[in-house]
Amino acid sequence: MKFIVKLYPEIMMKSKSVRSRFTKMLETNIRNVLKKVDEDAKVQRQWDRIMVRVPADRPELVDAFAERLGCIPGIAHVVQVNEYTFDSVDHIYQQVLPLYREQLAGKTFCVRVKRTGQHDFKSIEVERYVGGGLNQHTDAVGVKLKNPDLTINLEIDHEKLYMVVRRIEGLGGFPMATQEDVLSLISGGFDSGVSSFQFIKKGARTHYCFFNLGGSQHEIGVKQVAYHLWKTYGESHKVKFISVPFEGVVQEILERIDNGQMGVILKRVMMRAATLLADKYGIQALVTGESLGQVSSQTLTNLNVIDRCTDLLILRPLIAMDKQDIINQSRIIGTEDFAKSIPEYCGVISQKPTVKAVLSKIEAEELKFSENLIENIVAQAKVIDIKDIAIEMDNQIAAAEAETVVAVDTQEVVIDIRAQEEEEKNPLSLPGKTVMTIPFFKLSTQFADLDKSVTYLLYCERGVMSKLQALYLIEQGYTNVKVYRP
């Protein structure tokens, strides 16, 4: 079994040297991701495609490979194929017939052929010969070239024949790390998750900067979003998660700054702090989830004033998107449920926020801050490799005395906290045990209604979400919660 990875068309349009560099990077990225599934994954680069071979004795890897290939930037689509050899057009037909005889019963069909290499026949000749043979020797209704019930896709590569089993759409975009690094200001909401994804897709290694306004619970929620984005779409590369304690900044703004200027000044302080971090780690640009007119600080005038506080490039990929379009995109990339579960933390709320800030007034207000305020908070920032979030959760759970168990006692109840789509795709089966389903984004509100005399075991497939949720509940004072890792 093989996967043929087709490059995104924009890569194919590049010059020979750039195309070669992008293809090499994509090959490396695919190998880095798939080796986390199977150390023996075979990845081979060709000029216009990348071949991935699934070990013959490991058919269970097919779906896992397909899922991950569909989430790697730079891929237009992937076709899963069975590989054969042939010595004539009739030989091709003889191999196709037994595979499709039953599937064609009562259906219209057509045959499509893509061909690479020198042959004594044309692609259309193969289509006609194979299609005519199938039409005569099966119970098919007939050939239909437009909108058939079944399309038989064949690829001929020199002396090899590939029969397409299925097609997986890719992300598109450019391979990770073909563009320079960016630092995404992430809050855990709909906007910052989608804006981060846009730059991952565009091939920029995306690091995360979180300004903590809402305490440890807020940080736990934001880490869930960042970890999901990295694990799903950017796992081929290491990235940083930076948490900056911002409570002191909020306090000074509330105590010292004119009410109407608070929102713009808060954003300027964030940009200055993020700029210092970006300079420290050699990052080329900041990314925000701002959208024009969505809130008072996001008018053109205010965005211009915010930009004046730094020489670093500030990128706003969502600037012209409607809120519903952003939410729809978050649903596609899997961050919608996370965003729903994170409250809006507005540490700075102006009663009459300005929509036309004046730079001179803003700068005069900023003189009221304590000396070296921004430098001091940046010095307190915590920087971790994002892959270590799972390890960090283990340590925090141990410190909080929350157990991780591998078996379920009869008196314990398992709560499957996966999103509905994941739970339906791969249901948790524990014969003789009680299993409840509460999606993680509803757990914080529904857990209080559960029987406090019962011990609940939180379950998710990777174990990260269950640990994060257990930490959150323990911090809320619950002691009847554990993590279930079978």
Curated annotation (Swiss-Prot):
Gene Ontology BP terms:
thiamine biosynthetic process; thiamine diphosphate biosynthetic process; thiazole biosynthetic process; tRNA 4-thiouridine biosynthesis
Q: Which residues form the active site?
A: C460 (cysteine persulfide intermediate)
Q: Which InterPro entries match?
A: Rhodanese-like_dom (IPR001763), Rhodanese-like_dom_sf (IPR036873), Rossmann-like_a/b/a_fold (IPR014729), ThiI_AANH (IPR020536), ThiI_fer (IPR054173), ThiI_N (IPR049961), THII_Thiazole_biosynth_dom (IPR026340), THUMP_dom (IPR004114)
Q: Which residues bind ATP?
A: L185, I186, K267, G289, Q298
Residues in domain Rhodanese?
408-486
Report keywords, A-Z. Answer: ATP-binding, Cytoplasm, Disulfide bond, Nucleotide-binding, Redox-active center, RNA-binding, Thiamine biosynthesis, Transferase, tRNA-binding
- Pfam families per the UniProt record, alphabetical: Rhodanese, ThiI, ThiI_fer, THUMP
Q: Name one GO cellular component term.
A: cytosol
Pathway, per Swiss-Prot/TrEMBL? Cofactor biosynthesis; thiamine diphosphate biosynthesis
Which residues are in the THUMP domain? 63-167
Keyword Cytoplasm present in the record's keywords: the answer is yes
| Cellular location(s) | Cytoplasm
Q: Name one GO molecular function term.
A: tRNA-uracil-4 sulfurtransferase activity
Q: What does this protein do?
A: Catalyzes the ATP-dependent transfer of a sulfur to tRNA to produce 4-thiouridine in position 8 of tRNAs, which functions as a near-UV photosensor. Also catalyzes the transfer of sulfur to the sulfur carrier protein ThiS, forming ThiS-thiocarboxylate. This is a step in the synthesis of thiazole, in the thiamine biosynthesis pathway. The sulfur is donated as persulfide by IscS.
State the protein's name: tRNA sulfurtransferase
Gene designation: thiI
